[in-house]
């Protein structure tokens, strides 16, 4: 087995892994801060997070559908089409970001009522989700821009942006809650500011990268919309299924008690952290796989065999860790 395959997978995977893990890890910090305010507040975060996630995470195709297309275009040195794809992706970000903001902002009371929480939890959920809703467009911008950079083999930018978001979020969490006494409003606002600064960083990095594209590079006509959505359709269905499953579980928990909502909220993030371990390999390998497919050398290649072995090993590892240490992780 060619060790260079494992090296390429590692180089592309570790920034993505730590970036993906940081998001649920920071959400656990949000939950910790919320738990200091009270169980009802923590339950409110759980309900608000479910609504936000159901409407925003469905657009993960903006990331997963972008990376392989950018990678294949880069392999063909078709940077003119890469620029067109960036512009098209940003239009989608602005549209879906604005739409999501309006839906949550206008219909937040109705969306919260679907979980049938007690009055206090419903109020806390609204207090949390309204300021966080302003960060929707920044979050989607991060998804798209980081995906473009991964396709350009700049995966380290994904990790750097995640670190920026995590640090800003945690710092503002404690400042807004424990210094300015903003409560759940402060936690939601901290998240929005974190996404804003992270989006600014990625915008600057991508702008510098695009400035290196020369006018002499190849540029061919391709239907950007058709190519993008052909890659994104299956990913969109996967996202809808996963988000729907998690939202349904949270909805069932909300019908039992505030304690059940809080426990479900924590368990889902523990699950997310470990699943991200495997997902990071899938996300990072999109670049490598796309490059191989362009040259018609992926199927039955050492790379494909390496990816199958790595994912199988990680699946077994996650299963054993969760089976043995789940109670300790939750406590």
Where are each of the predicted segments found?
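Interhelical loop/hinge segments that connect adjacent transmembrane helices in multipass membrane
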Residues: 1-13, 188-191, 200-243
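Signature of the first transmembrane helix
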Residues: 7-67, 230-255
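Residue-level recognition of transmembrane alpha-helices
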Residues: 13, 20, 46-49, 93, ...
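Helix-terminus/linker motif at the lipid-water interface of multi-pass membrane proteins
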Residues: 25-44, 112-119, 175-182, 240-273, ...
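Small-residue-rich hydrophobic transmembrane alpha-helices
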Residues: 42-102, 139-153, 157, 261-322, ...
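Short membrane-interface helical motifs at transmembrane helix boundaries
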Residues: 99-130, 317-331
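Alpha-helical transmembrane segments of multi-pass membrane proteins
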Residues: 119-142, 270-274
